[in-house]
């Protein structure tokens, strides 16, 4: 696909990272994009943002970043117009759009996951929780931007959360049904698989940090940082998770008539009984993308185009990755995740990006008419760094984020800390 143009749909740090990676071998247009997306890549290919909808942009390949347009059927619409699309249609996107659907599909496919039940009324949900040992896991059935999960050992808190979700006061229609799960124990793994409808090819694994505060304290967020690879997992765990979780689910989707051509992201718990599924997402994870894609050394355009075309095999070698590690740290606005403050001037982004191996991906930013860069969302920037080890990558990421500043900026100081310590013990 020489001098191809790829259209990326989305506006966050994930889409910035996807565009940055694709621009090694193609011109990239991102819709609607953000102020950080633009310019000329080292390869000579251009990257630009464009507010026009993807249906009005001419491209050789379309890559859909966020889950909402996938669930709403954007991939189907583009394919109906003869476009080559990396992203599942609405039938496959139900895997993330409804946790109850996901659980039912997994049960039929024999995918190991936590015991569960789905409820639309508080009383039976609370009675079910009483039958479980704490901690209790309460999830919205629908999309909640990664914030619809409560894990607590307090039954009263869990019951109040169920009531808030089912009433619609917490997450609107997304919470009109809740999934209650048995808690699982073990380290978590984010596993990305590029799928062509029948085959799946893993990308480098990652681990993310969902809680706002150090030591996994505070509320759940969309993700405050990540690292890759995950030494506690290893190739054997990834291979087992692919065989027990990803491949059976993809086969079940195929048998149901869903031609799943896109990214299947499995959140996996490495339990004493082997890997078990926490949940599926139908797109690249954020912030994991910001550490996974910098490690991919192959031609991402060729890889995603092959999957979109229905046959990964000719491009399988393009999933190759560097042995180097990557660590990213998210800078969040004050008030995140409940009520983030916007409009605060940001400094130091360019200085951070001049450090070796560092890339600053924009998430929630906006540029004023006078050129000032300001905050425009909860997660504002994602600072990603490559290094020969997790320790080295982590040091670079934290050196870089220390150069960035805006009033009330918050970030975790312990991203990849345990993994870095494990390298020297």
Predicted feature locations:
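Internal nucleotide-binding/catalytic subdomain
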Residues: 152-288
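Short, conserved charged micro-motifs
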Residues: 157-160, 338-340, 388-395
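Active-site "cap" helix and flanking loop/linker of ATP-utilizing ligase/carboxylase catalytic domains
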Residues: 242-264, 281-355, 368
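Solvent-exposed alpha-helices and their adjacent loops that cap or buttress functional pockets
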Residues: 1-2, 23, 39, 56, ...
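ATP-binding N-terminal substructure of ATP-dependent carboxylate-amine bond-forming enzymes
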Residues: 1-91
């Amino acid at each position: 696909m020489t001098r191809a143009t790829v259209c990326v749909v989305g506006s966050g740090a994930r889409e910035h990272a996807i565009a940055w990676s694709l621009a090694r071998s193609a011109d990239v247009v991102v819709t609607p994009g953000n102020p950080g997306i633009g310019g000329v890549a080292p390869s000579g290919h251009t990257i630009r943002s464009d507010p026009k909808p993807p249906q009005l942009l001419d491209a050789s390949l379309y890559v859909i970043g966020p889950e909402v347009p996938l669930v709403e059927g954007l991939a189907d619409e583009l394919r109906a117009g003869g476009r080559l699309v990396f992203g599942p249609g609405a039938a496959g996107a139900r895997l993330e759009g409804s946790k109850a659907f996901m659980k039912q599909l997994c049960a039929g496919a024999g995918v190991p996951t936590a015991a569960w039940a789905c409820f639309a009324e508080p009383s039976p949900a609370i009675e079910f929780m009483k039958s479980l040992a704490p901690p209790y896991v309460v999830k919205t059935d629908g999309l909640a931007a990664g914030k619809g999960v409560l894990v607590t050992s307090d039954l009263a808190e869990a019951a109040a959360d169920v009531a808030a979700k089912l009433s619609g006061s917490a997450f609107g229609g997304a919470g009109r049904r809740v999934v209650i799960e048995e808690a699982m124990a073990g380290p978590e793994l984010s596993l990305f698989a590029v799928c062509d409808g029948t085959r799946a090819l893993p990308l480098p694994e990652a681990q993310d940090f969902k809680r706002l505060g150090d030591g996994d304290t505070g509320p759940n967020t969309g993700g405050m940082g990540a690292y890759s690879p995950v030494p506690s997992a290893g190739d054997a765990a990834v291979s087992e998770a692919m065989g027990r979780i990803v491949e059976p689910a993809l086969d079940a989707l195929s048998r149901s008539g869903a031609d799943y051509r896109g990214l299947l992201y499995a959140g996996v718990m490495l339990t004493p009984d082997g890997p078990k599924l926490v949940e599926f997402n139908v797109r690249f994870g954020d912030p994991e993308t910001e550490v996974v894609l910098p490690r991919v050394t192959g031609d991402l355009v060729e890889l995603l185009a092959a999957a979109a075309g229905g046959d990964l095999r000719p491009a399988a070698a393009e999933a190759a990755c560097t042995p180097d590690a990557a660590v990213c740290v998210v800078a969040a606005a004050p008030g995140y995740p409940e009520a983030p403050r916007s409009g605060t001037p940001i400094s130091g982004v360019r200085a951070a990006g001049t450090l070796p191996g560092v890339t600053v991906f924009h998430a929630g930013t906006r540029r004023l008419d006078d050129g000032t860069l300001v905050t425009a969302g909860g997660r504002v920037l994602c600072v990603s760094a490559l290094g020969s080890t997790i320790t080295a990558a982590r040091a670079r990421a934290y050196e870089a984020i220390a150069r960035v500043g805006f009033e009330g900026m918050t970030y975790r100081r312990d991203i990849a800390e345990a993994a870095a310590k494990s390298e020297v013990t």
